[in-house]
Amino acid sequence: MADEQFPAAVTALEEYHNIEQQMAEPEVASNPDKMRKLGRRHAELGAIVSAYTAYKQVKDDLEAAREMASEDPDFAEEAKRLEGELPAAEEKLRTALIPRDPDDARDTIMEIKAGTGGEEAALFAGDLLRMYMRYAEKRGWSVTVQSENTTELGGVKDVQLAIRAKGTPAPEDGVWASLKYEGGVHRVQRIPVTESQGRIQTSAAGVIVFPEADEDDDEIEIDPKDLKIDIFMSSGPGGQSVNTTYSAVRMTHIPTGITVNMQDEKSQIQNRAAALRVLKSRLLAMKHEQEAAEAADMRHSQVRSLDRSERIRTYNFPENRIVDHRTNYKAYNLDAVLDGDLQAVIDSDIQADEADRLANQK
């Protein structure tokens, strides 16, 4: 029977069961791309279905207890207890029904670029790279370095990563659900290894993140005529050759000017496929940003330049202090954060975002 108070939950339950039926069909089960898309939606609806099932259970038990209360005093006590539980179950369901970012369950492409500060900025970009790789390791995610330019001192001029979860995670456990808040300028304050007089220097690195598109994502179509593809020899740290074939690919999307370099894979064909997937991810992110702008509901803005004034977070080494300027989160465990203990910082952004979404629903 339909629930007049929560019709959206009933619709979600119906879709949830419909998806389960589709996933059981042999032709769907043998199609990994189709299964991934259905699995992602199934996981997204799962939170609603779980909250709705719990709410219905409390509500039905309460109605039954009230009917039996006139015959058995014990049921009157049970009804009183359930009356106390019902508001919390309702609130949990209302929260679950608040629309999530549809990309939360997606994997993520991340770019880290050294900004103002010369060699020190490149060294800090390397610190951020290690921090995110350690964080991904703690979360059980895989990290693929798709392209990287380093300095002689071991710093990072720029690096591109693909960070992916195992299987099909629930939206709240997706890579994008956590890492989407990392986009912006990260500022560091410390005494550089190149500083002979021991003065504290401020420099910065920029982080750009966007959800990774599926290989068969039909939301973005790219005309081959709009692509300019250059082939070159892969190179490693210090300009060393990775292999002796021209397998690296530079793919340019002519209408937007977006350029993707890919040399991580072993063959030119693999690098072309990987570059095309990253390009689709960037175009998908651009499309979603435009849609959000039109709806006056922009996502957390990311770095548009590497100016220190656009900082989202400051890493102060002398004080072992980290500050997130969007949420006013502050802690004195910078060493642990740079070793991948980033969850508390990210949680502060998630909680602020959820509070905003709740406020917009009221």
From Swiss-Prot:
UniProt GO cellular component terms: cytoplasm
Post-translational changes noted in the entry: Methylated by PrmC. Methylation increases the termination efficiency of RF1.
UniProt source species: Bifidobacterium adolescentis (strain ATCC 15703 / DSM 20083 / NCTC 11814 / E194a)
SMART domains xrefs: PCRF
Keyword Protein biosynthesis: yes
Position of the signal peptide: none
Lineage of the species this protein comes from: Bacteria, Bacillati, Actinomycetota, Actinomycetes, Bifidobacteriales
Keywords per UniProt: Cytoplasm, Methylation, Protein biosynthesis
Pfam family, one: PCRF
GO molecular function annotation: translation release factor activity, codon specific
Role this protein plays: Peptide chain release factor 1 directs the termination of translation in response to the peptide chain termination codons UAG and UAA.
Name of protein: Peptide chain release factor 1
Membership in a protein family: Belongs to the prokaryotic/mitochondrial release factor family.
The keyword Ubl conjugation is annotated on this UniProt entry: no
